[in-house]
Amino acid sequence: MKNLDKYLSLLDGEVDGLLLTSRYSRHYGAEFDIAEGAAIVTKAGCRYFTDSRYIESAQNNLKGFEVICVDGIGYFKLLNDAIADFGVSNLGYEEAYLTVAELMGYEKHLNAKLTPFNKEISGFRGVKEDWELELMRKAQQIADKAFA
């Protein structure tokens, strides 16, 4: 099961969408690391929002996500567009990775109920699949050669 599919499997109960704001969860779900952004994951579709510095890389590397540039528009409007387009009413979020000010902004501006969901979202990252372990082995071999 790919990482995005794992996130999608969380959508059968309490929430019908996930708001991924931490770099760790975005990297895990998209299987590609982009320093800035946010993502919404729903069964109806997945969108990844980032700015123009990363847009080309995101468009070329993010499988399973529609990539949207936030420049000149802003995250809240685009997130609300996704919430409306995908019919999201209850959005799970990563409370461990938001400041109080960020959470207050999301609560004020997003058109969906926000439900703390960090435990569920981050739970998958601790268990590695064979392909992830192989990538870690290759990275370690490269590091070993660099220091040899």
Q: Regions from the language model: what does each represent?
A:
Residues 1-49, 76-87, 108-114, 148:
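Terminal domain-start leader segments
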Residues 2-4, 76-148:
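Flexible, acidic/His-enriched mid-domain "rim/lid" segments that flank
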Residues 20, 71, 94-95:
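Small/polar loops that bind or transfer phosphate-bearing groups
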Residues 23-25, 50-56, 97-103:
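Short, polar loop motifs at secondary-structure junctions
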Residues 27, 53, 119-122:
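Residue-level signal for pocket-adjacent positions within structured domains
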Residues 50-81:
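Compact, glycine/acidic-enriched structural inserts
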